[in-house]
Regions:
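Helix-turn-helix/homeodomain-like alpha-helical modules used for DNA recognition
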Residues: 1-19
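Alpha/beta-hydrolase-fold catalytic nucleophile elbow
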Residues: 28-30
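A short alpha->loop->secondary-structure connector
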Residues: 18-26
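Conserved phosphate- and dinucleotide-binding cores of soluble alpha/beta proteins
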Residues: 20, 32-202
């Protein structure tokens, strides 16, 4: 149920967006896709672009590849470089905030599980994930030895986006939301009343 909630948060936001007539707006995909996802990033990009009368800019790549060399091949492709330059020019990002279960599920492709690849410090544990970036309860990034296999906006470039919106709700997401705010991975939060109340009480 919690995974379903995460998967539906951003797609539902896209579905509820009113149609607007905008000019010179581009909607850019920030990370690669998984075939098993209920709502793929490219599908969400298309939906938002349609609502805003904007141009979609898609990242045609998987989120996880088998080697550093394969990632470098993608990065060397002119089409990829064009999309990544668009990412660097982004003014606003919108991303769901996943909890620890989502972080573990995100990269689960074939026989690749995330747990053995986490480089945890003593006492550190996974609190959440946003845009493929995994963090602890205090918002500290958790390093992975497969970082060079992931195709997504790099953390340094993501944090340069001026307005970073996180979408998440429910009491079960509190640790993830808190970590995302402390990072700070986000500077705007869209959440539900219950989660907002609990965060304010801390």
């Amino acid at each position: 149920a919690m995974l379903k909630y995460y998967l539906l948060a951003v797609p539902q936001m896209a579905a509820q967006m009113p149609k607007l007539s905008t000019e010179d707006v581009t909607i850019v995909q920030l990370l690669g896709s998984k075939n098993s996802e209920l709502h793929t990033p490219s599908e969400i990009i298309y939906r938002i672009a349609e609502k805003l009368n904007a141009r979609p800019c898609l990242l045609f790549a998987p989120i996880l590849v088998g080697s550093t060399q394969l990632k470098e091949s993608f990065q060397a492709d002119p089409a990829f470089q064009e999309v990544y330059e668009a990412i660097r020019r982004c003014d606003i990002s919108i991303a769901g905030i996943g909890n620890a279960a989502r972080a573990e599920e995100l990269f689960l492709q074939g026989n690749v599980a995330i747990k053995p690849h986490l480089l945890l410090e003593p006492g550190q544990y996974v609190a959440g994930e946003i845009g493929s970036h995994i963090f602890d309860i205090n918002g500290n990034p958790i390093r992975m030895n497969i970082q060079n296999h992931i195709i997504a906006v790099e953390l340094e470039d993501y944090r340069k986006i001026p307005t970073r919106i996180g979408v998440a709700g429910s009491e079960e997401k509190l640790s993830a939301i808190r970590g995302a705010m402390l990072g700070p991975y986000i500077n705007v939060l869209i959440t539900d009343t219950r989660a907002a109340k609990l965060l304010c009480e801390e």
